[in-house]
Amino acid sequence: MSSTTEWKVPAANQPRTGDYAFDLDHVLASVVGLHSIVPNDAFSADNLGTERAGNGVVIDDGLILTIGYLITEAEAVWLHLGDGRVVQGHALGFDSESGFGLVQALGRLDLDPVPLGSSATAEVGDRVVLGGAGGRTRSVASHIAAKQEFAGYWEYLLKEALFTYPAHPNWGGAGLISNRGELIGIGSLQLEREREGKSEHVNMVVPIDLLKPVLEDLRNFGRVNKPARPWLGMYTAEIENKIVVVGISAKGPASRAELKAGDVILAVKGEKIISQTQFYRKLWSLGPAGVDVPLTVYHEGVTFDVVLASIDRTKLFKGPRLH
């Protein structure tokens, strides 16, 4: 959902100033709209599109924290402020492990940074606000519904993600604000869960504590200054204790090895795999990007061994250009 279109969160889900121990309007003013343009030939264009929109949160003078998929390979970024101004930005950095992205404003924002809180001390049941650009009418009064491991199908794993309910309809890059007015996470996804026999939406939020060890690297180098994890370029799902390939990324090692959707990953380097989290942890334990990854695969009645030469996924990305 674009941050620039006219819409409002249902009134019943909007935060009310008297319910929080901080200046709600002042903090929410530092959540900005974000709009990016990505080249048609970018690696991420097929999956994420060439025009992306969401939110970002001012965390330092001219520095905006967002979710990385909004700015990956962006050639142009604009920041939409609450007073109607539009300021150009520069995609400064992206951390593929956490999913965080940083944008540097190329003009004055005149907005106070939102202080960083602690996601570790946040507890299930805590009252929070998932803040979107546009103030209270585009923000959601939520609570922390769960803190638990999250495995994404795209070779992504969080040890302890935050899940909030009710869900924000424009969750990408939204700021999770604690009852102290501090930033404790950034919105990433909307998921469905079953509760009391009914299906309901929740947001998955990347916890802010994952930013603190990598923030300076992202500011200085645009990425975390350590060897990248090995990447195979396969999308998988955990189905009945089996890891099933549901898609293959073009140009990735899995594509070159001619793995197909429907294949089942039985083992990594001889270790039987029964969960997505186990699969990722075993894969990443083999070494940095470039390491050979021996897999045992089941394909249409045949079991075979294959070795994939892993790569650094970010090497496929177009680098940002400073205008």
Tell where the protein language model's regions lie, with residue ranges.
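C-terminal cap/linker of serine protease catalytic domains
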Residues: 1-24, 111, 137, 183-239, ...
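Conserved active-site neighborhood of the chymotrypsin/trypsin-like protease fold
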Residues: 7-11, 39-41, 51-53, 58-139, ...
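Active-site-proximal beta-strands of protease catalytic cores
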Residues: 31-35, 64-68, 123-134, 164, ...
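Flexible, gly/ser-rich surface segments that form the specificity/activation loops bordering the active-site cleft
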Residues: 49, 70, 112-159, 192-199, ...
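Conserved PDZ fold ligand-binding element
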Residues: 60-65, 180, 184, 254-277
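PDZ domains, with a preference for the canonical peptide-binding region formed by the helix
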Residues: 70-72, 267-296
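Active-site region of chymotrypsin-like
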Residues: 106-114, 139-201, 230-232, 238, ...
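A short glycine-leucine-enriched loop at secondary-structure breakpoints
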Residues: 118-121, 174-175, 180, 247, ...
